[in-house]
Amino acid sequence: FNSVYIFTLQGDEPLVSPNLIDSLAEAIQNSDFDCATPIIRIYNLTEYLNPNFVKVTKSITGKALYFSRSPIPYVRGNSFDVGNFDCEKFFIENNFYSHIGLYAYKYKSLEKFSLLPESNYEHYEALEQLRMLENGMNLLCVETTHKACAVDVPSDVSKTEEIMKKMGIK
């Protein structure tokens, strides 16, 4: 099973692009990482502060460093006071990312992950990918421009239905 890859898509991400799945497949095949997952740039303060948007920090090689529902990285000395802060410029000039709930695992890595008990940070944040990080597994962050349509709260259902209607999906 050395060349078998398993993809998991979280149920709250109903409109993931097939192209995004293809890019994850390519990324995991050509890497030494255990798992690959997509990330997308954050361009506004609302998403950055919203706990339903899972934020991620990564190394320059794309290795995930941490995932959180809190705003990470923390911006020291900046209150995001709208009166004296150019929010749009800030997010354009700085790389802040949010996570999309799709994973491409190497078979052996998923097998290992499935045997691990819930970790401390996973319990605190309710984010299973933290179990991998806490146990020394390597997650590759694959940047995308595909904006996912997550359904995290009841008000997201009508937004998603409207997008699906525009796409011709019933």
Residue ranges, per PLM feature:
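Short beta-strand-to-loop acidic/aromatic patch adjacent to the donor-nucleotide binding site
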Residues: F1-G11
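Short, high-confidence coil segments that cap the C-terminus of an alpha-helix
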Residues: F1-S3, S31-F33, M137
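A short, conserved beta-strand element in the Rossmann-like catalytic core
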Residues: P14-L15, A148
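Conserved core of the sugar-phosphate nucleotidyltransferase
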Residues: V16-L116
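A secondary-structure boundary/capping signal
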Residues: L9-G11, I39, K106, V153
